[in-house]
A protein has these predicted regions:
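Extended, well-ordered alpha-helical scaffold/bundle regions in very large, multi-domain proteins
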Residues: 13-14
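Catalytic or ion-translocation cores adjacent to nucleophile or general acid/base/metal-coordination motifs
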Residues: 1-2
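C-terminal amphipathic alpha-helical interaction region
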Residues: 6-9, 18-130
Length: 130
């Protein structure tokens, strides 16, 4: 659903959310530069992956859909943890943990979204048994 119906608008809904994440990260740079930069970089990578995904055919989108959803979740989680930490300094340690330990998982997930479906369709039951 995320990479099919929700991308029918050329990814506009995703871009609006990414814009929100980037604006918040930019605003947080003055008080939490390292955390904010990590969130901004991840959201920019998500933007680039979204652009690539929108340009793929539907089979290729579906092949990368789970990885894309997981990467999007990592970026949004980092965004919301950073916002919570800015609102309540007692939550900054959890935000830092999430951003430094869990957010980096977005990169290999986004790499998977670019692979398309060819490798999936090339797998045969026999190859899985080898």
């Amino acid at each position: 659903d995320l990479v099919a119906r929700k991308m029918m608008d050329g990814g506009e809904a995703a871009y609006r959310l990414i814009d929100e994440v980037e604006a918040a990260a930019e605003a947080a740079r003055s008080s939490q530069p390292a955390l904010a930069t990590a969130v901004w970089n991840a959201s920019e990578a998500l933007r680039e992956a979204t652009e690539a995904l929108v340009g793929q055919d539907l089979n290729d989108r579906f092949a990368g859909s789970v990885a894309y959803l997981r990467a999007f979740a990592r970026v949004l989680g980092a965004h919301y943890h950073l916002q919570a930490g800015l609102a309540d300094p007692a939550r900054l340690p959890l935000a830092a943990f999430y951003i430094t330990r869990l957010l980096p998982e977005y990169a290999p997930l986004l790499a998977q979204t670019r692979e398309g479906a060819a490798g999936l369709y090339a797998l045969t039951p026999e190859a899985l048994l080898a």
